A protein has these predicted regions:
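Cell-envelope/ECM-targeting effectors and their regulatory/trafficking segments
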Residues: 1-134, 139, 220-224, 239, ...
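Hydrophobic/aromatic-lined pockets within catalytic cores
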Residues: 27, 61, 141, 145, ...
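Surface-exposed patches in mature extracellular/periplasmic domains of secreted proteins
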Residues: 34-41, 65-69, 143-155, 168-172, ...
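Conserved aromatic-histidine-acidic binding/catalytic patches
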Residues: 41, 124, 143-147, 196, ...
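Active-site-adjacent structural elements in enzyme catalytic domains
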Residues: 55-58, 84, 149-163
Length: 304
């Protein structure tokens, strides 16, 4: 049974994840749509899709109206799910790479950005938002340590939430004011003997806090000298370093002791409880929803 979150077709919200699902269903109902060739499954609603939905509604015996739209709990979706195609069985018209477990090197970043903008229109993907998401996607594709495309989906969902849709590493709001880790401390560079006054409040794609954690991440990532997070905590705001912190931390349980493999293994993904990797179950349901939609888009764009 195929479900959609929002309406598709004439006057619909036409979110790409939903559009792909309906395009696939339409192609499995050629006995009612009268299509001679399948629709291109693109994730973008167009006149061809609207006409096919209308034709399906006109020709299906259980449907009385033809408004050219499929609603999440409507009769048209129920009828589409009956799969009355010529072969009498459901076929997949998704891209061949849709089922791949890992992100591929030929991942279509440009296509993802276009579909993402349609999927999440409340936060327009312009300027630094677009460049930031592009940078993050390229880092995910290049990361040899990511064994599962679902890991990438949950990392993206986490950044979307933690960085408030900016897709840029950010500083903690309030810079630790009133918190124990928000007090300035003096640290000395062992090589140059230069003394720095630093405050170890949250920074990055995910918030790295406390002096000891900055030290530990230096060790984990082999950072020293000018690259040392302990000496130069502002380095956690650089995209490359912020990504390394997030990837290592989420894979190895550096933040809360919980890690990606605790919740996402093979084809199984507990996106709700995966929030425990970062912050208990705070906003877990919201981030779960992001992860599910982002996983679908990642899969759809995982090739050219």
């Amino acid at each position: 049974m195929t479900h959609i979150a929002k309406s598709v077709g004439k006057g619909g919200a036409n979110r790409p994840v939903d559009v792909v699902k309906i395009q696939n269903l339409i192609n499995n109902n050629d006995s009612y749509t009268k299509l001679t060739t399948p629709l291109a499954v693109t994730g973008v609603a167009d006149t061809a899709l609207n006409d096919a939905i209308t034709a399906f509604q006109d020709n299906h015996p259980d449907l009385k109206t033809s408004d050219g739209r499929v609603d999440p709990r409507g009769k048209t979706l129920k009828a589409l799910n009956q799969y009355n195609n010529a072969a009498k069985q459901c076929r997949s018209y998704y891209p061949l790479w849709f089922s791949k477990l890992r992100l591929e090197k030929n991942f279509d970043v440009t296509r993802f950005l276009k579909l993402y903008a349609r999927q999440f229109p409340r936060h327009p993907l312009t300027g630094t938002r677009q460049s930031g998401l592009k940078t993050l996607l390229e880092a995910l594709v290049a990361d040899a340590n990511l064994d599962n495309i679902r890991w990438a989906a949950y990392m993206l969902a986490t950044v979307k939430h933690e960085c408030a849709n900016t897709w840029q590493p950010i500083e903690e709001y309030g810079k630790g004011a009133g918190r124990p880790y928000g007090k300035a401390v003096k640290v000395t560079d062992p090589a140059s003997k230069q003394v720095y006054t630093n405050t170890y409040y949250g920074r990055g794609y995910v918030q790295l806090t406390w002096e000891d954690n900055y030290k530990k991440m230096d060790t984990a990532l082999s950072l020293q000298g000018a690259d040392s997070l302990h000496l130069h905590p502002e380095k956690a705001l650089e995209a490359k370093t912020a990504y390394r912190i997030m990837s290592h931390g989420m894979r190895n349980g550096s933040f809360t002791g919980k890690k990606l493999s605790s919740y996402i293994v093979g084809t199984s993904a507990d996106y709700f409880n995966a929030r425990r990797i970062i912050n208990g179950t705070d906003q877990a349901l919201l981030i779960k929803g992001y992860a599910e939609e982002l996983e679908f888009l990642l899969r759809f764009c995982n090739g050219k």
